[in-house]
Amino acid sequence: MNVILSVMLFSSPSCVNINSFDILIVGAGISGIVLANILANHNKRVLIVEKRDHIGGNCYDKVDSKTQLLFHQYGPHIFHTNNQTVINFISPFFELNNYHHRVGLKLKNNLDLTLPFDFQQIYKLMGKDGRKLVSFFKENFSLNTHLSLAELQLIDNPLAQKLYQFLISNVYKPYSVKMWGLPFAMINENVINRVKIVLSEQSSYFPDAIIQGLPKSGYTNSFLKMLANPLIDVQLNCKDNLLVYQDEKLFFNNNLIEKPVVYCGLIDKLFNFCFGHLQYRSLAFSWKRFNQKKYQTYPVVNMPLAKSITRSVEYKQLTNQGSFKPQTIVSFETPGSYAINDPRFNEPYYPINNTLNDTLFKKYWKKASKLKNLHLLGRLATYQYIDMDKAILLSIKKAQQLLS
């Protein structure tokens, strides 16, 4: 069911009365929306300003006008969490479908392999040697042990080394180098180790999740429910210079603002890139419609060995909507270096957390901390990759801080 947005959409910044709200939130992504919901429920008047023409940030989804299929404009978002506080918060807004994530691999040998790599994948890949290796794992490790690639490399067993060489050469290294645009040795180890090798017959992509899936009505409709409070006003299509840092003060719409400001945008941009630009990876999407019920075996298929594309995503398999329709929508993702003026790569998706960038970010963080009414929240403002459940939890904590 669609929810009507019961918030005021200002036509221009001149309509905004700086005295008409208690707290300003810059950014209508998941972090800002969750925060606004909690604050409004505590009788705070909240103004959200957003430069895009829609709410939801990168979680935004919409219905394709030609096929009537729901898709994610900025790539797939699968919700998962093991945090009860987050579960309690989303319960009135998210009714999750029963989707459990699994990622297919498209490799040269055309084997039906998936991630995470588990015993079933080892059998398919290595045959008799695979059965020997699984026996070795069962004798020497506890069932359901999750091994990182680095841990697999250290196992003194020739078949384990054979598996390691296959994974490093065909999966982890080519995918990561393409994704991050860096030599493999320079890529953050935490990034490489996000997907483990699971010592069990079956495995889950999100093994710690208590709940996982996608909202049955879509993320956008779920966010509209969160914003359905008369104390929340939203302004879309904003100029991105409404909030300005000048002379160690913040100005909103050319007026000095001393009320709390929660900023969810690029932290380096807020401070006019005074220390330099933080680096991000971006994505370019190629969208295709197919006149068939199903395009690929798995909802998400990683392509480590393809020249430029990292993965393809078939959205009807994620949303569980339109399975009967003889059409489907698939996106193909190509990563590149973020640059604001690049027509393909002008959206900052993934912070490149290395020594250089993290040192630069700390300078901006220190500068921001001197502004007593400024609060940084979300992926761009805190320069870190944040899963949706963590974004929600951080917004809950920020609300508690602002209300205390």
UniProtKB/Swiss-Prot annotation:
UDP-alpha-D-galactose binds at S176, W180, Y205, N302, R311, Y350, Y385. Its EC number is 5.4.99.9. One of its GO terms (cellular component) is cytosol. It catalyses: UDP-alpha-D-galactose = UDP-alpha-D-galactofuranose. Transmembrane segments: none annotated. It comes from the Bacteria. It is an enzyme of class 5 (isomerase). One of its GO terms (molecular function) is UDP-galactopyranose mutase activity. It holds the Pfam family GLF. Its cofactor is FAD. Keywords: FAD, Flavoprotein, Isomerase. FAD binds at S31, E50, K51, N58, H77, I78, R379, I386, D387, M388, D389, K390, A391. Involved in the conversion of UDP-GalP into UDP-GalF through a 2-keto intermediate. Belongs to the UDP-galactopyranose/dTDP-fucopyranose mutase family. This is UDP-galactopyranose mutase. It comes from Mycoplasma genitalium (strain ATCC 33530 / DSM 19775 / NCTC 10195 / G37).
